[in-house]
Amino acid sequence: MAGQFRSYVWDPLLILSQIVLMQTVYYGSLGLWLALVDALVRSSPSLDQMFDAEILGFSTPPGRLSMMSFVLNALTCALGLLYFIRRGKQCLDFTVTVHFFHLLGCWLYSSRFPSALTWWLVQAVCIALMAVIGEYLCMRTELKEIPLSSAPKSNV
């Protein structure tokens, strides 16, 4: 159906490159947020903050700051969905994919499956925030008016 508006073409290379790009955005921005938080509280940065499920918690200040970094990262990644994915229908797919690979990364890093309830809660909140805000931003872009002519308007 060549005449269909916004027809979707299956392009595995594009999808793989978008997955890699979103993983890069996810870990790059998470690293920046964690570095900023560590600089503010004069803490030493560690990969444990990113990949150890036991770090996240309400009882310790580093745990709360790490949770805040994850939530801020979800907002930043929603902008990544807007600029790199650009389709509201695909935001949830890419969000879940990014977090699934993060789950695998945490599992490999700590050699055990994440079992901390706070880790799962933070990931669920981040998935919801990233998907909903990313979809909202993408839909706003998709619903913009399409200019039909480049001629200047005349007031008649």
From Swiss-Prot:
Q: Which GO terms describe its biological process?
A: protein transport
Pfam families, per the entry: SYS1
- Report whether Ribonucleoprotein shows up as a keyword of the record: no
Membrane-crossing segments per the record: 13-33, 65-85, 91-111, 113-133
Report how it sits in the membrane: Multi-pass membrane protein
Q: Which GO terms describe its cellular component?
A: Golgi membrane
Task: Answer yes or no on keyword Membrane.
Answer: yes
Q: Which UniProt keywords apply?
A: Golgi apparatus, Membrane, Protein transport, Transmembrane, Transmembrane helix, Transport
Q: Where in the cell is it found?
A: Golgi apparatus membrane
Please give the family membership noted in the entry: Belongs to the SYS1 family.
**Function (record text):** Involved in protein trafficking. May serve as a receptor for ARFRP1.
Q: What protein is this chain from?
A: Protein SYS1 homolog
Q: Which organism is it from?
A: Mus musculus
The root-end lineage is: Eukaryota, Metazoa, Chordata, Craniata, Vertebrata
